[in-house]
């Protein structure tokens, strides 16, 4: 019987593959003042979103599941990610941002990333 270590890819190979995907997407995606880049970072427990103006190198608005409101929220990680999408949409609208370029940072458009994106669209962001 083969051990799980020989069946699974090593974590470093997965990390390298994700870094390649991220670099491939990042060289095509660039945020401007009119259409800043909305980058989603995902960890095993949390989701972080920043709306970035790449010309000036400034973060315009941000939200994450680390905020007090969402830490106390009950539910699964996908529901919390959807709430983060709603919050980032509201904060972006308050800052005068309606259009963004979506950067999933090498992650698959599935699960928490998709839930966040759909909630941000419903909150009024166009991407």
UniProtKB/Swiss-Prot annotation:
Gene3D superfamilies: 3.30.420.100. Residues 1-26 are annotated as: Disordered. Part of the 50S ribosomal subunit; part of the 5S rRNA/L5/L18/L25 subcomplex. Contacts the 5S and 23S rRNAs. One of its GO terms (cellular component) is cytosolic large ribosomal subunit. Disulfide bonds: none annotated. GO terms for molecular function: 5S rRNA binding; structural constituent of ribosome. The gene is rplR. This is Large ribosomal subunit protein uL18. Residues 17-26 have a biased composition (Basic residues). This is one of the proteins that bind and probably mediate the attachment of the 5S RNA into the large ribosomal subunit, where it forms part of the central protuberance. CDD domains: Ribosomal_L18_L5e (cd00432). Keywords: Ribonucleoprotein, Ribosomal protein, RNA-binding, rRNA-binding. GO terms for biological process: translation. InterPro entries: Ribosomal_uL18_bac-type, Ribosomal_uL18_bac/euk. Pfam families: Ribosomal_L18p. Belongs to the universal ribosomal protein uL18 family. It comes from the Bacteria.
């Amino acid at each position: 019987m083969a051990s799980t270590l020989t069946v699974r890819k090593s974590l470093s190979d997965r990390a390298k593959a994700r870094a390649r995907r991220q670099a491939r997407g990042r060289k095509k995606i660039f945020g401007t003042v009119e259409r800043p880049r909305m980058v989603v970072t995902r960890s095993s427990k949390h989701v972080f979103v920043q709306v970035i103006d790449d010309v000036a190198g400034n973060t315009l608005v941000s939200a994450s599941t680390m905020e007090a409101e969402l830490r106390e929220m009950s539910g699964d990680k996908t529901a919390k990610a959807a709430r983060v999408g709603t919050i980032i949409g509201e904060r972006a609208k308050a800052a005068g941002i309606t259009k963004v370029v979506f950067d999933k940072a090498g992650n698959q458009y599935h699960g928490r990333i998709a839930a966040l994106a759909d909630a941000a669209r419903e909150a009024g962001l166009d991407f």
